[in-house]
UniProtKB/Swiss-Prot annotation:
HAMAP family per UniProt: FadB
Pfam families to which the protein is assigned, alphabetical: 3HCDH, 3HCDH_N, ECH_1
Reported function: Involved in the aerobic and anaerobic degradation of long-chain fatty acids via beta-oxidation cycle. Catalyzes the formation of 3-oxoacyl-CoA from enoyl-CoA via L-3-hydroxyacyl-CoA. It can also use D-3-hydroxyacyl-CoA and cis-3-enoyl-CoA as substrate.
Gene Ontology molecular function: 3-hydroxybutyryl-CoA epimerase activity; delta(3)-delta(2)-enoyl-CoA isomerase activity; enoyl-CoA hydratase activity; long-chain-3-hydroxyacyl-CoA dehydrogenase activity; NAD+ binding
CDD domains to which the protein is assigned, alphabetical: crotonase-like
Protein name: Fatty acid oxidation complex subunit alpha
Taxonomy of the source species: Bacteria, Pseudomonadati, Pseudomonadota, Gammaproteobacteria, Alteromonadales
Secretion signal span: none
Region (Enoyl-CoA hydratase/isomerase): 1-189
Length: 716
């Protein structure tokens, strides 16, 4: 053994080829400080051994290296620029040391080689991948750029155009696609991986392969003619900005760094990367996006833990077919859990099956599935008009019409047909789980399971704990949601649960603006373009449905009369009473037609403006800051109330609920990250300016205390 540490082992194989194996104690390899220090020490040991003629990098795991240890980032990025620069330079010295070894090097890549893992393989002369390999630099998705030489080496390996696409999108690439652009030199079967890498090194040692010429290309400036370079980078800037937009600076910074470094050798090029990396690491966007990544890990960790308490779900059922039932059935079956779809009407079952088939056909058309897989998934969906089909179901999801009496009746009925230990969950967006539980003989085996529409696209599922729900029930439904490929957050029962409870104060703020003559299209534009929502409030209400919004608003007003009670007609009422229900009937705030691709296309409609003018008078212009404050303050305060009341367990889960359930702008990180970035004291001062607008604008006592103490919701 040439070198050994808890994360890396180096041994000498036949023909004096050294093998460096990444072998961290956990399930995956990642570059934390310890692994980086071990790699540095291992390379020193390798350099000192005069017998070594070549080096192969391998992994003992199913993956190569998944990237840097992101849990270290926020603390590290909070350091002074000089400290951060020192860390980046020390880390890069390790990768330079690998690249500068006096003999040929190769990486044997399986599974993920992402971020720092990808930058490791770029520092070797040859790269062999097996068919499971996925390679990429996802840093721009975290608001930063590669910091271990990725922007320098990748363009010199695969060309500037390809590198610009890889780095600016942050997407990982399959082995076959990496081979096409020259990121890897060969793709082999998993069992042949190490042998193929060693054979390539033997050929390099025997001078059949010119490893030094390859290395020199990475150390030199890019060989791009001036005119071609100018055209390439100008085109890239336009394309990248069109996708990334003004709120996500990292992709554009990556283009700029690659352009500036294109005429430099390695040392100068790395300095350009270092400076841009440090600048981006200090941004609020990086803090927000890294925070989302860490929050996602926390939520998934909780779900994994729940799996240990959970009853295994081998068979499921959904009550109520149609679009929602079909979506739930598709999601369950496509992730491997057979499901019975029960309804009282054959046309509803046909609609549900058609919905599942339509979603599967789209997967096949996009090349993400095959007709064989589609048939297998459809065979996992069993339509039935009879409750008897549910007798083997471990979990039954009730998804009938959103009416308390009908739901209660169906829940009471189904309890008589399922097994003693079956779990029943209600897919409801507003109806109290405690209320529905009153109709059940075993309320401990009942909870809420709120899917968001469309089911196949929306990642969030709210699992609602009723006062009688057992821990096993909650754990089992959380585990089932995870198995379906969803991100579950557990919330306690209250009107609207978590997501709808915080959404409707936002709509109330919007209604307030319209009642004073606000222009809904202008408000949408501000909330989309400036704040960053995927849809403004008027457009979102049209998509949700004004009938659904009208009903949910009434539920919220009844549940929280002090803050959400209504004294008169608002804009939602106006649209609903005039049968303008949104996209579902082609007219709401906007009017809808179908474009050439069959998608709804919205246009401003003078009729809706006329109705609002009749109700609220002439249009009035509001400043953008005023629009943002009046819509967002109620949502933010209500979110804080949910945390204080224990409806949601942590700031992390609340923020993930907002990002995944409502499309809260990821670059802002969620309400609690937004509050911390703004400063709680600054927010309280802003809210106080609008306190005269009513209860939704009144901050809590705990918020005032936190503001006075200069506190934050996340620990630095």
């Amino acid at each position: 053994m040439i070198y050994q540490s808890p994360t890396i082992q180096v041994e000498l194989l036949e023909d004096n080829i050294a093998k460096l194996c990444f072998n961290a104690p956990g399930s995956v390899n990642k570059f934390d400080r310890e692994t980086l220090a071990s790699l540095d020490a291992a390379l020193d040991s390798i350099k000192q051994n005069s017998n070594i003629k070549a080096l192969v990098l391998t992994s003992s795991k199913d993956t190569f290296i998944v990237g840097a240890d992101i849990t270290e980032f926020l603390g590290l990025f909070a350091q002074d620029d000089a400290v951060l620069l020192s860390w980046v330079e020390q880390a890069n010295a390790v990768f330079n040391k690998l690249e500068d070894l006096p003999f040929p090097t190769a990486s044997a890549i399986k599974g993920f080689a992402l971020g720092g893992g990808c930058e490791t393989i770029l520092a070797t002369d040859f790269r062999i991948a097996d068919t499971t390999a996925k390679i990429g630099l996802p840093e721009t998705k975290l608001g930063i750029i590669p910091g271990f030489g990725g922007t320098v080496r990748l363009p010199r390996v695969i060309g500037a155009d390809n590198a610009l696409e890889w780095i600016s999108t942050g997407n990982d690439q399959r082995a076959e696609d990496a081979l096409k652009v020259g990121a890897v030199d060969a793709v082999v079967a998993p069992e042949a991986l190490e042998a193929a890498a060693i054979q390539m090194l033997k050929d390099a040692v025997a001078e059949k392969l010119d490893w030094q010429a390859r290395r020199n290309r990475k150390l030199s400036a890019l060989t791009l003619p001036k005119l071609e370079a100018m055209m390439s980078f100008t085109t890239a800037k336009g394309m990248v900005f069109a996708v990334a937009g003004k709120h996500y600076p990292a992709p554009m910074a990556a283009v700029s760094v690659i352009e500036q470094a294109s005429t430099k050798g390695r040392a100068e090029a790395l300095q350009i990367e270092h400076q841009a990396f440090i600048k981006l690491a200090k941004t609020d966007v990086a803090k927000a996006l890294i925070g989302i990544f860490l929050n996602d890990q926390l939520v998934k960790g909780k779900a994994k833990k729940a799996g240990k308490l959970a009853k295994e779900v081998k068979n499921a059922a959904v009550l109520g077919a149609g679009i929602m039932g079909g979506g739930i059935a598709y999601q369950s079956a496509s992730k491997g859990t057979p499901i019975v779809m029960k309804d009282i009407a054959q046309p509803a079952l046909d609609l549900g099956l058609n919905e599942a088939a339509k979603l599967l056909s789209a997967q096949v058309a996009r090349g993400r599935s095959t007709p064989e897989k589609m048939a297998k998934v459809l065979n996992n969906i069993t339509p039935s008009l009879d409750y008897a089909a549910l007798k083997h179901s471990d979990v039954v999801v009730e998804a009938v019409v959103e009416h308390p009496k009908i739901k209660a009746q169906v829940l009471a009925e189904v309890e008589g047909y399922v097994s003693e230990d079956a779990i029943i969950a209600s897919n409801t967006s507003t109806i109290s789980i405690n209320l529905l539980a009153k109709s059940m003989k075993k309320p401990e085996r009942f909870c809420g399971m709120h899917f968001f529409n469309p089911v196949h696209k929306m990642p969030l599922v709210e699992v609602i704990r009723g006062e009688h729900s057992s821990e096993e029930t909650i754990a089992s439904v959380v585990a089932y949601a995870s198995k379906m490929g969803k991100t579950p957050i557990v919330v306690n029962d209250c009107p609207g649960f978590f997501v709808n409870r915080v959404l409707f104060p936002y709509f109330a703020g919007f209604n307030g603006l319209l009642a004073e003559g606000g222009d809904f299209a202008a408000i949408d534009k501000v909330m989309e373009k400036q704040f960053g929502w995927p849809m403004g409030p008027a457009y979102l209400l049209d998509v949700v449905g004004l009938d659904t919004g009208h009903h949910a608003q009434a539920v919220m007003a009844e549940g929280f009369p002090d803050r959400m009670g209504k004294s008169g007609t608002d804009a939602i009422d106006v649209m609903f009473e005039n049968k303008r229900l949104g996209q579902k009937n082609g007219k709401g705030f906007y009017v809808y037609s179908v474009d050439s691709r069959g998608k709804p296309k919205k246009d401003v409609d003078p009729t809706s403006y006329g109705l609002l003018k009749d109700a609220f008078g002439e249009l009035k212009t509001f400043e953008a800051d005023d629009i943002i404050a009046r819509t967002m303050i109620p949502m933010i305060i209500e979110t804080v109330r949910c945390l204080e009341e224990g409806i949601v367990a942590s700031p992390a889960e609340a923020d993930m609920g907002l990002v995944y359930g409502l499309g809260f702008p990821p670059f802002r990180g969620g309400v609690f990250r937004y509050l911390d970035t703004m400063g709680v004291a600054n927010f309280v001062a802003l809210a106080d300016k609008y306190a005269h607008l009513g209860g939704l604008y009144q901050v809590t006592d705990a918020m005032r205390t936190k503001a006075t103490n200069n506190g934050s919701y996340y620990q630095a």
